[in-house]
Amino acid sequence: MAYVNFGEDNQLPFNIIKMIGIDEVMSQNKLFNVITCYGAGLKYMDVDTRQPTTHPEIKRWLIHNSLPLFQLEQATDMKYFFFCVSVIILSRDGKRINRLIHKEACYCRFQQARRGKINHVIYANFRENASLRPEDYEVIRLLDPRDPLGDLMVLMGREPGRDGETRARTDDRKFAILVRFPTPGFQYYPIPYYTSIFRGDWYDIKRLIGKGKKAKLR
């Protein structure tokens, strides 16, 4: 299955991680942004009491899916790459969401769009362009980013599509959900605004100043 490279050599996300990691200010700024985005964490509130739910089934689902970790993972990818991917796994009868899983954005690639729509997310270890076998790729059906719930309802045969027809329920039970922060040009992979730092001169100058001072101390 053909996918779109993430950067010219398909290594852009790993290069971004490296460039942020070697800058002590930027890396701490990213941590601050993620923690701020996390805030007080996710809470499922009861509509009537306006307090965190005490419903045993809901509480069990929240615990088994580790929502605090999920939120931190999603926030981290959003702050680094301006997009994040999650996967929902339905029950066998297709009536419930059993699992909610985060997928690392740096290992996600998008299938080439057909008629303006991306139909699948490809998940694999693309680091250093490692040699991958067909079984190393996880191909996940992507729900419509603008209306994932509506798309899921149509695929499960619970609502008619835009053509007014109700389809037979799909056999798929695993679906990807994509959230992208809007950037000019609407590329496959957003170009975060902060990456202008790397395209300017001061990122390199700042590092050279540190190296120069270090050399004088020797």
Feature annotation, model-predicted:
Residues 1-22, 34-37, 41-218:
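Structured, contiguous alpha/beta core segments that scaffold functional sites
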